[in-house]
């Protein structure tokens, strides 16, 4: 028996789990030779575009949306997104980056431009006008050689411009199974998630053996979430020092503490919402809520508009929340029935997506001054239906780029 156990452990330790997060790199980039697109000019590029060449790969339409000095594009096919950088050189706008499908690993390079005749002069001088984006795209690490042309169709609708809709990313951006370039629930993923059009994130909160709140989804340390380490077993069996010293997430990052994650988010992102998914540790509220309040105070001091909701997914977590002195003043999100939402006076009700659009109940929550989010919706047809026909204030998804496309293309 001892020999069998040894052989099993040897086999387990030799297993290698591949996490294919290939990102193609553009050789001989023109970007270092150009100047950044002026902040005042960027909004003139934003809007809905018609794809007149390349539609077989990406669909009929695309959305262009800036985030800081970079921008993303979103199209309907497989929740495709483009991660792009842009400069202007001699009044021509050059754009380089890569595209990828949300629902699988298909990816490739993209090289685009807006010539003087096709709108770059108007954009750079802050004027409306015709815009045609021309260029090429590739597959995998091949150089771009297939034509891609996008023609500006319209700006975002008034409905979109006036909306306070939240594009919420699951596990700070996506799951490890989605083969993204950063691990789920990592600082690096919080940095990367803006490429999906994300405006808010959900993160999972657990306590270590010595009571430090960390961001980690599973009960135990395993090959799905971490690289091989000498630590095996439930997360709660280890101190923060032990986890920090010996455990790395699948892309080499350290497991962040809740305080580290929120501090980074406040200081280094434009995200405006955080959903703390409490995983049910006993007496966690007395530790987590002060960290939530500290992060909110930091955001206010930096004039960073931010909401942080303590998630209440079970009755036990609700009981812990209600036992916290002054819980009435703590912003929370409840996943249970409307009566539970009212009992805890939650700021947000968040039912699972399989319950449907529930328009009447959503309107009741709105009448009571609450927001309503739906989780975790990844099916494209239902996502479109929920945005077009529902009254939700936000959707939580592993594929936020899909959410962004359907939201920004609303008429």
Predicted regions and their residues:
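C-terminal motif of bacterial Sec signal peptides marking the signal peptidase cleavage site
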Residues: 11-14
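Phosphate-group recognition and catalysis centered on beta-loop-alpha active-site segments
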Residues: 16-411
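Sec-dependent signal peptide recognition
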Residues: 1-9
